[in-house]
């Protein structure tokens, strides 16, 4: 080819396509090299072989399988191949959103335990320590981190020569001007792999941006316009389409569930319409009239119009999203449900689903709407978990775990925070309270339930306000999704128009007028009850009946939407749900809509003129001047008397106290239910806990008298009540009495190495076995004490040696260990006192935390003295002797000489 052609054309492969691998990778090979805990499906094994081929051809690539088909496990299998077959020790860098970081870590541990994986997270100080460790010890295979930390510590990560750079949820890179895109282009990587369930969302430009990451030499930044211009008319030019297929074939693999996961249960989407309450209608009109200037010049007022659209969407969700609308004293009641047509429908929908034994993922765009839904869940007594953008990684993981392991009815999620990477197949019903402008976000959210591992049919229910902007937003999203499906199909890039459709030129000011004719036809509520069974279909034994389609979906207020990839999806939209009475509302507002809007505007202007001529000036033209509110004099805020203020204060206090009491009762009920479930689980596994009961220590607190007077008494006691000795605490210097050895552990259930951990393992096989089993059975909480004998290998002639493991440290999911938590240590010492008192035993401790920088030994010593020594328990603190080391007396115990 001529040298003047763009680089991507110079690298165009031959007509016959890429040469196949001489030797295919088989699953037994991967198992031999270290793959465990999974049986790859045939299409996943094909994907692994395709990735291997790309690696050998030195092509970066995009694995664009639909959400839920196992892109993570295919990537891990590739890394296993590189290490096991090619002896490529990496390092490999994996970038992903924070929301799926724990999932990546768990699947690395599960599928590739032979690969060492470092999770690079934490605050600045923690990451600095990790950087030092990684520089000193480079023997890791995989470094796992998030986009945000990659940007913060780009200079450190650039210092490595990565064998593989893998980016999960890679549609984050669709803009080649973004900081992350520019940063990753500076990384040194032999092979670049992008994972995304949505390889193209809007345009050829976005696709080129991804190609620019995987093969920057072929798809250079400067030639994006050449790419767009060459292929923008591929729908008309079959030669260009064929050329584009060949160009993309080495770089892009895309499979959808309908093609490869035929055993996956069916997914059906149903659109259910709802009316509006009178309160919602009132505010809907008021929002439209708040800023009339915005409708005069759309180009200049686009931001204002977008704000109006957002406010209208909030109004359709719930009027309480606006300050000052909810009536005082802010007590949850039926008014919360009746104020919103959407929540009125959702209330009946959830009751229907609950009685049928279904479990629900409930998505909303707005976290404030999730707040209202959370109040509603508490009011109705439904069990739920919640995840949104404010929920930290550890809490997010716990919520997902709880939903998977417990019969929780609803999982509340924000679409963008909860729509990425989560596996929530315990749910069989997905409800979208409102729709995203980008349909790919909704698709990803629905894929949390409809994915590999789901064994039930999935029903996706979308709630849309009738005759509101929600209708036109959803229609535009559906059109956008149809365009995307034309662009990429069956693993190839296929002909599809990339020019904006007619709707893209649709004026925003026109969107806001949609449906006004019918919406404003009456002032009253348009909410009504509908037959949910006829709309949603049959349900039996907690499962949707896959073969029974709803009989009255379209007629009864609902509309069936086809599953992605089905034949229905490619049909004409001529009979779409937006075609009412022969008029296509998806194209533009009707004449009646425009007429109703003009009437509103004229009325608003008349009211403004009357108010102005009446001698009053408006401080804010955005005042809510609508029929029913503007008639008569403007109502002033009532000035309350001191008695009325006091009465209101008391009512608010009573309401707050009642809410607090109800929340406490529900919390206790939930804890009791969880405890009963855990006891049943333990019994089914034959597990017996070694934890000391906390009831006796709580009783001891009640009987212990005045703490302050006790503290004063301790000051007068001789410090020799603690015996300081030199020796090995695992072989206590005891007489004929029982001896309790104390050791502090964390709540992870992973036994440590070195120091006292190793010494205890030499002494007995029980500590590691009992501690790790307690971790597996979720029997390790801060403040717990595991007490058990350790005389299995050696014993004294008289008296028994026991080990008390105090859970006093927390290890988070990124393997960061906290310091010793004094409250947990104190709780543990209380329990040890009662056990030692009953057994008439002595207590033997190492110098807890002596190697920890900044550890409060003085406070620890006081706790030991307070709860053990001064209460009659023989207490010994051991200093381990080391060669050529002289043991000096601790400053806090100057009168206690050490035994040499």
Swiss-Prot record:
Protein name: Chromodomain-helicase-DNA-binding protein 1-like
Free-text note on domains in this protein's UniProt record: The macro domain mediates non-covalent poly(ADP-ribose)-binding and recruitment to DNA damage sites. Mediates auto-inhibition of ATPase activity by interacting with the N-terminal ATPase module, encompassing the helicase ATP-binding domain and helicase C-terminal domain. Binding to poly-ADP-ribosylated histones upon DNA damage releases the auto-inhibition by the macro domain and trigger ATPase activity. Does not bind monomeric ADP-ribose and mono-ADP-ribose fails to release the auto-inhibition of the ATPase module by the macro domain.
Gene3D superfamilies with a match to the protein in the record: Leucine Aminopeptidase, subunit E, domain 1, P-loop containing nucleotide triphosphate hydrolases, Tandem AAA-ATPase domain
The UniProt record lists the keyword Coiled coil: yes
Function: ATP-dependent chromatin remodeler that mediates chromatin-remodeling following DNA damage. Recruited to DNA damage sites through interaction with poly-ADP-ribose: specifically recognizes and binds histones that are poly-ADP-ribosylated on serine residues in response to DNA damage. Poly-ADP-ribose-binding activates the ATP-dependent chromatin remodeler activity, thereby regulating chromatin during DNA repair. Catalyzes nucleosome sliding away from DNA breaks in an ATP-dependent manner. Chromatin remodeling activity promotes PARP2 removal from chromatin.
Pfam families per UniProt: Helicase_C, SNF2-rel_dom
Regulation: Adopts an inactive conformation in absence of DNA damage. Binding to poly-ADP-ribosylated histones activates the ATP-dependent chromatin remodeler activity.
Record motif DEAH box, residues: 168-171
Region (Regulatory linker segment (RLS)): 606-640
GO terms, biological process: chromatin remodeling; DNA damage response; DNA repair
Domain of life (superkingdom): Eukaryota
GO cellular component: nucleoplasm; nucleus; site of double-strand break
Residue ranges, compositional bias (Basic and acidic residues): 653-673
Gene giving rise to this polypeptide: Chd1l
UniProt similarity note: Belongs to the SNF2/RAD54 helicase family.
Main subcellular location: nucleus
Stretches assigned to coiled coil: 643-680
């Amino acid at each position: 080819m001529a040298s003047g052609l763009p680089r991507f054309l110079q690298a165009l492969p031959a007509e016959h396509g890429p040469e196949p691998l001489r030797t295919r990778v088989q699953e037994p090979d991967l198992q031999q090299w270290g793959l465990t805990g999974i049986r790859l499906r045939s299409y996943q094994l094909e994907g692994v072989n395709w990735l291997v081929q790309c690696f050998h051809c030195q092509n970066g690539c995009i694995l664009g399988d639909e959400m839920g088909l196992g892109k993570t496990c295919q990537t891990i299998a590739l890394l296993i191949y590189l290490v096991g077959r090619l002896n490529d020790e990496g390092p490999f860098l994996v970038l992903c959103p924070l929301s799926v970081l724990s999932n990546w870590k768990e699947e690395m541990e599960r599928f590739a335990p032979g690969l060492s994986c470092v999770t690079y997270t934490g605050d600045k100080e923690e990451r600095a320590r990790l950087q030092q460790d990684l520089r000193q010890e480079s023997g890791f295979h995989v470094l796992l981190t998030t986009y945000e930390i990659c940007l913060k510590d780009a200079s450190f990560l650039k210092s490595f020569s990565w064998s593989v750079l893998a980016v999960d949820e890679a549609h984050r890179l669709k803009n080649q001007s973004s900081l992350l895109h520019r940063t990753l282009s500076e990384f040194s990587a032999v092979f670049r792999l992008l994972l995304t369930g949505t390889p193209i969302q809007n345009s050829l430009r976005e696709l080129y941006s991804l190609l620019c990451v995987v093969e920057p030499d072929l798809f250079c930044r400067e030639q994006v316009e050449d790419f767009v211009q060459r292929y923008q008319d591929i729908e008309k030019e079959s030669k260009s389409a064929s050329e584009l297929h060949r160009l993309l074939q080495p770089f892009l693999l895309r499979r959808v569930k309908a093609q490869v996961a035929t055993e996956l249960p069916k997914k059906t989407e149903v659109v259910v319409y709802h009316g509006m309450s009178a309160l919602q209608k009132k505010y809907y009109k008021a929002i439209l009239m708040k800023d009339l200037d915005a409708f005069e010049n759309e180009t200049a007022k686009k931001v204002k119009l977008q704000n109006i659209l957002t406010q209208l969407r909030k109004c359709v969700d719930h009027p309480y999203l606006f300050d000052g609308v909810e009536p005082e004293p802010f007590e949850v009641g039926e008014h919360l449900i009746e104020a919103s047509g959407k929540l009125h429908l959702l209330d009946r929908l959830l009751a229907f689903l609950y009685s049928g034994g279904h479990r629900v993922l409930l998505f909303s765009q707005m976290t404030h709407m999730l707040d209202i839904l959370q109040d509603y869940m508490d009011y109705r007594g439904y069990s739920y978990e919640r995840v949104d953008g404010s929920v930290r990684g550890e809490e997010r993981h716990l919520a997902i775990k709880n939903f998977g392991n417990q019969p929780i009815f609803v999982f509340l999620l924000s679409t963008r925070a909860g729509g990425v990477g989560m596996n929530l197949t315990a749910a069989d019903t997905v409800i979208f309270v409102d729709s995203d402008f980008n349909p790919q976000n909704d698709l990803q959210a629905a894929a949390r339930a409809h994915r590999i591992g789901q064994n039930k049919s999935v029903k996706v229910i979308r709630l849309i306000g009738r005759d509101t902007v929600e209708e036109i937003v959803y229609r535009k999203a559906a059109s956008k999704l149809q365009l995307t499906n034309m662009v990429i199909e069956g693993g190839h890039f296929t002909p599809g128009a990339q020019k904006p459709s007619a709707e893209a030129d649709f004026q925003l000011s026109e969107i806001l007028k949609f449906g006004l004719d019918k919406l404003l036809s009456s002032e009253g509520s348009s909410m009504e009850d509908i037959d949910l069974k006829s709309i949603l279909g049959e349900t039996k034994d907690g499962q949707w009946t896959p073969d029974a389609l709803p009989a009255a979906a379209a007629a009864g207020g609902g509309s069936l939407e086809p599953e992605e990839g089905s034949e229905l999806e490619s049909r004409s939209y001529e009979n779409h749900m937006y075609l009412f009475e022969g008029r296509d509302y998806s194209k533009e507002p009707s004449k009646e809509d425009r007429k109703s809007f003009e009437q509103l505007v004229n009325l608003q202007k008349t009211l403004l003129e009357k108010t102005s001529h009446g001698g009053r000036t408006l401080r804010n033209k955005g005042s809510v001047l609508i029929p029913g509110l503007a008639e008569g004099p403007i109502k002033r805020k009532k000035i309350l008397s001191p008695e009325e203020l006091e009465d209101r204060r008391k009512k608010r206090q009573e309401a707050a106290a009642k809410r607090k009491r109800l929340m406490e009762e529900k919390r206790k009920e939930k804890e009791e239910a969880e405890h009963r479930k855990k006891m049943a689980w333990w019994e089914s596994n034959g597990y017996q806990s070694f934890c000391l009961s906390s009831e006796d220590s709580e009783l001891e607190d009640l009987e212990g008298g005045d703490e302050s007077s006790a503290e004063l008494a301790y000051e007068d006691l001789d410090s020799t009540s603690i015996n300081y000795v030199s020796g090995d605490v695992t072989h206590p210097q005891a007489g004929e009495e029982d001896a309790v050895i104390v050791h502090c552990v964390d709540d992870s259930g992973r036994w440590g190495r070195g120091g006292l951990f190793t010494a205890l393992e030499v002494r007995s096989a029980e500590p590691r076995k009992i501690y790790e089993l307690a971790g597996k059975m979720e029997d390790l909480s801060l403040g717990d004490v595991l007490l058990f004998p350790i005389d299995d290998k050696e014993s004294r002639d008289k008296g028994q040696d026991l080990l008390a493991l105090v859970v006093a440290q927390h290890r988070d999911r990124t393997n960061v260990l906290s310091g010793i938590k004094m409250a947990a240590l104190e709780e543990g010492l209380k329990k040890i006192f009662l056990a030692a008192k009953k057994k008439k035993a002595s207590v033997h401790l190492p110098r807890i935390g002596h190697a920890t920088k900044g550890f409060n030994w003085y406070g620890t010593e006081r706790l030991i003295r307070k709860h053990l020594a001064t209460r009659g328990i023989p207490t010994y603190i051991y200093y381990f002797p080391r060669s050529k080391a002289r043991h000096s007396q601790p400053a806090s115990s100057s009168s206690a000489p050490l035994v040499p």
